[in-house]
Amino acid sequence: MSKCYITGKTTLFGNRRSHAMNATKRIWKANLQNVKIIDENGKIQKVKISARALKKLKLQRA
């Protein structure tokens, strides 16, 4: 399962509820983006980062 490299966000599972409260399964997927970053050793690394983490954090992108 895909996971955010920074925040650890993954897919959430739950139910969709109709007006009559009938339940059907559904999933919520994290908005993950493929990004190349430069890690602390100076190496380029391809990781998946959530869009929120990408906006909030100032990463050194490759």
Curated annotation (Swiss-Prot):
It holds the Pfam family Ribosomal_L28. GO terms for molecular function: structural constituent of ribosome. One of its GO terms (cellular component) is ribonucleoprotein complex. Disulfide bonds: none annotated. GO terms for biological process: translation. Keywords: Ribonucleoprotein, Ribosomal protein. Signal peptide: none annotated. Belongs to the bacterial ribosomal protein bL28 family. This is Large ribosomal subunit protein bL28. It comes from Aster yellows witches'-broom phytoplasma (strain AYWB).
